[in-house]
């Protein structure tokens, strides 16, 4: 595994745990058939999730997913003790249905401005700063679709089945093996791991 550098690392069988892993519609970076797949369960109001996304996942998207070496799947896992995280998850889910780029813009802004909207609940205004007027209208039109909440519930149920108890938790599948990791992993550490699995 990754030794003491990680909070938790449990080897799992390489499962279908992600039929979703092969679903292009859920891949927010990289190709569905990339040699490595990272599935992240995250909460927009979680400070550790903010750090992990901005300092680790964003570089992974830029350096690995853009070259189709890694497929990144993001799962919404809003925690009950976070008052506004469910609303943020709904906006992000709707944005992904509009397009991956819109999802990235919304996710970036929600995490960058987390301290503000977590306090005052201004999720809508935060999302509005991330999107063009046209894209914002498309996202808002989707919010009333029951499928948005249903998708979040599926993510929550999937996470619970896979042993997710806190955020961020992510799963890496490479070379036929899946590992579960809980907590923040620095990009420099994750990069070494990815390179070792890619034979670089």
PLM features per residue range, with description:
Residues 10, 40-43:
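Processing junctions and N-termini across compartments
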Residues 41, 127-200:
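C-terminal cap of thioredoxin/glutaredoxin-like
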Residues 34-37, 67-71, 99-105, 134-136, ...:
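Loop/turn elements at helix/coil->beta-strand transitions in domains of secreted/extracellular proteins
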Residues 38, 46, 170:
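Conserved S/T- and glycine-rich ATP-binding loop of Class I adenylate-forming
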């Amino acid at each position: 595994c990754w030794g003491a550098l990680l909070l938790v690392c449990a080897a799992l069988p390489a499962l279908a745990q992600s039929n979703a892993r092969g679903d292009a519609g859920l891949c927010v970076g990289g190709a569905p058939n990339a040699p490595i797949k990272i599935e992240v369960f995250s909460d927009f109001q979680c400070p550790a999730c903010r750090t992990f996304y901005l300092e680790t996942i964003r570089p992974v998207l830029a350096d690995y997913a853009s070259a189709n070496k890694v497929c990144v799947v993001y799962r919404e896992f809003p925690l009950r003790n976070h008052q506004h995280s469910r609303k943020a998850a709904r906006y992000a889910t709707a944005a992904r249905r509009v397009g991956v780029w819109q999802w990235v813009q919304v996710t970036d802004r929600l995490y960058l401005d987390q301290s503000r909207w977590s306090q005052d609940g201004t999720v809508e205004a935060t999302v509005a700063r991330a999107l063009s007027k046209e894209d914002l209208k498309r996202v808002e039109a989707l919010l009333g679709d029951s499928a948005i909440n249903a998708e979040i519930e599926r993510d929550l149920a999937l996470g619970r089945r896979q042993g997710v108890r806190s955020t961020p938790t992510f799963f890496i599948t490479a070379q036929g093996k899946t590992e579960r990791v809980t907590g923040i992993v620095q990009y420099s550490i994750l990069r070494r791991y990815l390179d070792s699995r890619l034979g670089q």
